[in-house]
From Swiss-Prot:
The lineage of its organism: Eukaryota, Viridiplantae, Streptophyta, Embryophyta, Tracheophyta. This is Antimicrobial peptide 2. Residues 1-40 form the Chitin-binding type-1 domain. Disulfide bonds join C3-C18, C12-C24, C17-C31, C35-C39. The keyword Disulfide bond applies.
Amino acid sequence: AQCGAQGGGATCPGGLCCSQWGWCGSTPKYCGAGCQSNCR
């Protein structure tokens, strides 16, 4: 699912991180630099 700026401000289900590219995931690639929501 898309999230963040690319997804109309949507957040990710299940507490997943929103990457700088606007996609949901749980790895540092998503949760690290540039993360848009649910960041760790």
